[in-house]
Amino acid sequence: PVPDSGRIAALEMARTLGVQYREGFVKNRYIGRTFIMPGQSVRKDSVRKKLNTIEGEFKNKNVLIVDDSIVRGNTSKRIVEMARSAGAKSVFFASCAPPVIHPNVYGIDMPAREEYIAHGRSVDQICEAIGADWMVYQRLDDLIAACTGDSTNAVTFDCSCFDGCLLYTSPSPRDSDSS
């Protein structure tokens, strides 16, 4: 997995697939979330400083890299490059989130939608852009089912980054102008 964001999902994937869970990256815990850092060059440089590979986990192996999400694709692309540089034969990539195609209007400072790797691209095009041999995104309905389990309680999730549907809307300034 990509530490630490992909670890929980990677553990469950390994169990479900019946394969041994392995970690091939070591994380520098003093580097923050790269997708929210200002400027493309800062983000790219930070990915390399943030992660180092354990070559023995990649050399001559087919690997599945699991991360929590893909926003711009910079981190995913760099991680795939690092796995290949460490000797991976094939690199497969799994995103625990559906494609991010809409901004988060509730407070997370996300880039303009044109900067999202999933904006206007197919999964095959995204796979090619990050340099993976194959990739898969979590389906939104599966993500919701995984979070709710067998619960019969009605639960509403903010899925606006994936489906564009806002839970709450606030009036625009002109709508609230009563004069």
Describe these PLM feature segments:
Residues 98-167:
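Acidic, metal-coordinating catalytic segment for phosphate/diphosphate chemistry
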Residues 61-71, 75, 120-130:
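Phosphate/diphosphate-binding loops
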Residues 1-7, 11-15, 20-25:
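Phosphate-binding active sites in nucleotide-utilizing proteins
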Residues 16-64, 74, 101-111:
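Short, glycine/charge-rich flexible loops or terminal/linker lids adjacent to PRPP-binding catalytic cores
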Residues 168-175:
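Conserved small/polar residues in nucleotide/adenosyl-binding loops
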